[in-house]
Regions:
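Hydrophobic or amphipathic alpha-helical targeting/insertion segments
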Residues: 1-7
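Conserved, charged catalytic cores of large soluble enzymes
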Residues: 20-27, 104-110
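Substrate-binding surface in catalytic domains of secreted glycosidases
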Residues: 10-18
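Well-ordered, non-membrane alpha-helical segments in soluble/globular domains
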Residues: 25-30, 67-69
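C-terminal functional module detector
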Residues: 12, 35-45, 51-65, 70-362
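Conserved phosphate-coordination/catalytic loops
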Residues: 24-28, 132-135
Length: 362
């Protein structure tokens, strides 16, 4: 399903009857409803796709509701009305899956979706996962842009809890489960499925003002990111002229906007021989654990029609060095005491900043 967000107040939103699955299960009918709303009220609205890690490959399918191949018109409308997608929530994240990111040691974090089972067709299983997870969807979008002239999966990401209890806790110390039966009670132990859920899902928005309008505008331009719970502060800019010293400027965000575009933006075309640079800063949750590293995941669609993915460590903590061959750094360590569910901040860093260039840019 989709979550629908209105920029406007009740004076406009109440002019239409809410659209639901009782009206239609075809997402194109929802898009038509959103278009009618904007024409009728001169308001603004957008839809956010629900975490699709249990969608059996349908969330990012290359066919429509009737199983016909998607068209350029379909792709254009999906990108128009669904600029964001929910990448994480209580039932796990939908960034990627070990089956389709086998070289990413973190790909199995808080995994809910089923794993490959013996006797199953591996190619069919992997194709199903590509229709459920974000990284694969972004690559599919690049492929469809070549084939259709439009990219249906050109979205930013958000996080949410998807709580079914009205208690939207994203922190472990406040987590009471996803369903009413997960809450503390004499019957809680009978719901063994509750162990699969995890506190998760925050959306961070770089808005110009803390108002409904300001937040909606930031959502629309995709200047957002998601975390699995920690209140990590992240800045990410792309440009052609960032310098290493920019990563340590007190006005880092000002430099970021002046020299490039923020997360969700589009870089201008490169001049011949130019290599893009990325200005990145991550700060830990003030009440949370230190940071191990910052990674950049690169996906590209080759001239031969193949999809590729590579994960880069771009800055790491505790004075460690990234090997010149690009191989990844071992984890910083682990101070977790499983017996009492505590940790100490004796390893890692509170802030990591870098200007990074892709050493393999073509």
């Amino acid at each position: 399903h989709r979550n629908v967000v209105f920029k406007d107040g009740g004076d406009k939103a109440c002019q239409v009857r809410p659209f639901s699955a009782m009206d239609s299960e075809d997402v194109e009918d929802l898009w038509a409803f959103l278009a009618r709303y904007e024409r009728r009220t001169d308001g603004q609205v957008l839809a956010i796709g629900h975490n699709g890690n249990l969608s059996w490959g349908r969330m990012f399918s290359l066919t429509d509701y009737n199983y016909d191949p998607i068209t350029a018109d379909y792709a254009q409308r999906r990108a128009r009305w669904e600029p964001l997608y929910e990448i994480t929530q209580y039932k796990g994240d939908s960034e990627t899956h070990p089956a389709i990111s086998p070289n990413d040691e973190f790909a199995d974090f808080e995994r809910w979706g089923r794993k490959f089972t013996e006797g199953e067709d591996r190619e069919e299983f992997e194709e199903e996962k590509r229709g459920e997870y974000v990284r694969a969807a972004l690559l599919r979008g690049l492929e469809q842009e070549v084939k259709l002239g439009e990219n249906p999966f050109k979205f930013g990401v958000v996080g949410a809890t998807d709580s079914h209890t009205s208690l939207t806790a994203a922190s472990e110390d406040q987590f009471l489960g996803k369903m009413p039966t997960n809450a503390p009670s004499p019957f809680r132990v009978s719901d063994l499925g509750a162990a699969k859920f995890a506190a998760s899902g925050r959306t961070a928005v770089w808005a110009e003002s803390n108002t409904r309008e300001g937040i909606f505008d930031a959502l629309s331009r995709k200047e957002t990111y998601a975390t699995t719970g920690p209140r990590i502060s992240l800045r990410f800019f792309g440009g052609w002229s960032y310098e290493q010293d920019d990563a340590f400027r007190s006005d880092l965000s000002g430099v970021g906007y002046a020299k490039g575009v923020p997360m969700g933006g589009e870089l201008s075309l490169a001049a011949k021989g130019q290599v893009p640079s990325f200005l990145i800063q991550a700060q830990k949750d003030p009440l949370g654990a230190n940071l191990d590293r910052v990674q950049v995941v690169k996906g590209w669609y080759s001239r031969s029609g193949e999809q590729h993915e590579r994960v880069y460590d771009v800055v790491v903590s505790d004075g460690r060095e990234i090997p010149s061959d690009g191989s990844r750094v071992a984890p910083v360590g682990n101070t977790v005491n499983i017996a009492d569910a505590t940790y100490t901040n004796t390893i890692g860093d509170g802030e990591l900043s870098v200007v990074w260039q892709d050493p393999d840019f073509d």
